[in-house]
Amino acid sequence: VLRNDGYELACYTYANIGYGESGTAEIEADLALWKEEVVPILGEVDTLVFAQNSDIDDGTAAYYGDKIALLQKYGFAKFIGFCDEGSSWVSLNDGYLRQGRLMVTGSTVAHNSEWFTGIFDTANLLDPSRGDVPA
């Protein structure tokens, strides 16, 4: 139903593990479970959103090595990581797209409000009666 309404679905890993800190064997085991348990329900997806604020490489450079080869073997061509500097970015590489996303959470809104300047006014989002938001 969601796809019929124009939504594009993505993988967030099977077990919510950080692929940056994981070895290829652990990533492959996670992807095998995704393919076995989730793909029959959702269908194939080509977008991977890295869990745990993780990425398989630092910075915005092109990926290389065993991890990107493994992810591409499982059909992924779009990779979305987390930007902790407050600005999103997109990098189009040979055969895949890499993007850094800006996460909107209570913590980022409370402690990094400058990240959202020009997007929305963070002062209107947090309820002061709820107390401090942990960092």
Residue ranges and their predicted role:
Residues V1-Y14:
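A structural motif
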Residues T13-I17, S54:
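Active-site-proximal loop/turn and secondary-structure-junction residues that shape catalytic pockets
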Residues E8, E21-A135:
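C-terminal active-site subregion of NodB/CE4 polysaccharide deacetylases
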